[in-house]
């Protein structure tokens, strides 16, 4: 009987690379995505096309309201997504695109799903560039959540260890794209943009777009998605 794995899937290059990595193992894959604001609704649409390329046992899209978490450009319509010209302009501190407790919320849902379906492995696509700016992407956070998961669940208390896997945790975006290209990831079906147009074009100037474009450039590969 195959082991089951829950994968947090956003439709971006990082989680898609994780999906590709896990798809080459013997895990039975259960993908979990979230629709939490209009600015991420395009991600959810992209996932529908992306997931057809993989042998995913089940894909769940969970609708949650994070708009009560005001103060983030990704959940508050009154805050503009900051735009930049290059990587030199990117913030070195926690940016306004940080969503309070987002990964804790997402991982908590994943933990609940894992316990229900009998999975002991959860995968998330956080990496080096993420935890430079986002506190809930750091290695120590992942380790702490795993410890909590094993304290707070029936399976954990019964000695069946739950593991939070972050296979990209020590990689930069450049290295992730390189790895994904080697594995055959179709990045044309992914999106990174924090502020896409209504017809699905990426802005090319938000933090996420700038980092993505830089990663493809360093790999001497044209980014296959369309920009404004």
Curated annotation (Swiss-Prot):
UniProt pathway: Purine metabolism; 7-cyano-7-deazaguanine biosynthesis
Entry EC no(s): 6.3.4.20
The organism's place on the tree of life at top rank: Bacteria
Cofactor note: Binds 1 zinc ion per subunit.
InterPro entries for the chain: QueC, Rossmann-like_a/b/a_fold
Keywords on record: ATP-binding, Ligase, Metal-binding, Nucleotide-binding, Queuosine biosynthesis, Zinc
SUPFAM superfamilies xrefs: Adenine nucleotide alpha hydrolases-like (SSF52402)
PANTHER family: 7-CYANO-7-DEAZAGUANINE SYNTHASE
The family this protein is said to belong to: Belongs to the QueC family.
Protein name, as recorded: 7-cyano-7-deazaguanine synthase
Name of the encoding gene: queC
């Amino acid at each position: 009987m195959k082991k089951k794995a829950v994968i947090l899937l956003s439709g971006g290059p990082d989680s898609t690379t994780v999906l590709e990595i896990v798809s080459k193992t013997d895990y039975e894959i259960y993908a979990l995505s979230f629709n939490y604001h209009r600015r991420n609704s395009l991600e959810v649409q992209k996932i529908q096309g992306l997931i057809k390329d993989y042998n995913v046992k089940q894909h769940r899209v969970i609708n949650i309201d994070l708009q009560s978490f005001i103060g983030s450009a990704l959940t508050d319509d009154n805050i503009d997504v900051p735009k930049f010209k290059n990587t030199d302009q990117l913030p070195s501190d926690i940016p306004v695109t940080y969503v309070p407790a987002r990964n804790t919320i997402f991982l908590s849902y994943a933990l609940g799903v894992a316990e229900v379906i009998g999975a002991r492995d959860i995968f998330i696509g956080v990496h080096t560039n993420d935890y430079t700016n986002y506190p809930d992407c750091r290695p120590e956070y992942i380790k702490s959540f795993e410890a909590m998961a094993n304290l707070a669940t029936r399976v954990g208390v019964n000695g069946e260890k739950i593991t939070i896997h972050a296979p990209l945790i020590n990689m930069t975006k450049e290295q992730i794209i390189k790895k994904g290209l080697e594995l055959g990831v179709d990045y044309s079906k992914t999106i990174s943009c924090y502020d896409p147009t209504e017809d699905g074009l990426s802005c090319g100037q938000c933090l996420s777009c700038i980092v993505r474009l830089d990663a493809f450039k360093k790999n001497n590969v044209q980014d296959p998605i369309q920009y404004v």
